[in-house]
Amino acid sequence: FEELRNNDFQENLPLGPIGRESEFYAFWCKYLSGEKNLTLKAFKGGMFSDRFAWVFLSGYQSAIQHTFSEMSSDHWASFAVSEDRRGTLPGLDWSKTEKGILLNGYKTWVAAVDQMNTIIVKAGRGDRAVYLAVDRDHSNLTLTRKEQGFLPEMSEGVAHFQDAVVSEKDLLSDKNVKQFGKIEILYIYLAFCGLVASKSKDTTVVDNSWAIAEEISALVHSEDFFALKEVDVKVQQLRDEAGGNMLGVSGWDADQKLIAMYSKGIQSRGD
């Protein structure tokens, strides 16, 4: 982070607003896909952002690549876990066939459905659960747009697998999956710090954002939940301090809830 700050980090910042997901994806592919350091990747993504949808997606992509290191880093993926537990859409299950792994069922929340190249899914439950990476163009996968949710610029969708056969080579390791919830928050917080570092008019707030990012980067490989609680307090304070002095951030008042919403769960958990 020190090297990034000492260099002219504003050199590649967008010259104007990026209002469409496809535009931010193209920008991300050009300037960030080759970044191997996932903490810097999330932070830089936040610096390039001008709204919270891009902050979320920047952190989300680093979290996915952290969790599933087998995944390519040069395009977007979506980790689809949610299912219709109370409705009529059956959840995703699998069976083994001579041709490979047969998938049938639905995933009800796919982030960045318009841009993602790969959908990562959990199929089955309990001891039967497996994780697979499926190309968005699979002939037996249907992706349907749904009404946009909590971040208006981010596309969302539903995935329907109907007799979709995938190779066992598409199986992913689940060794880091249990940590995804925590990891996702940390990378999104990093992206938020990047947003504040590049958009705040207050030099003290900017300094704080860089310092907090350093702290967060040290936690992505740590299991110290108390430290996460401490850094969450600092991130929420940063959010309060940054409000009112941000330049060119679309939807700040409405969408800062993205950062606020994680805090209650973090602070209510035991150490």
Model segments located where?
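Short, mixed charged/polar active-site loops
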Residues: 89-91, 128-131, 156
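DPxDG-like acidic metal-binding loop motif
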Residues: 104-137
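Alpha-helical metal-binding/catalytic segments enriched in His/Glu/Asp
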Residues: 64, 161, 196
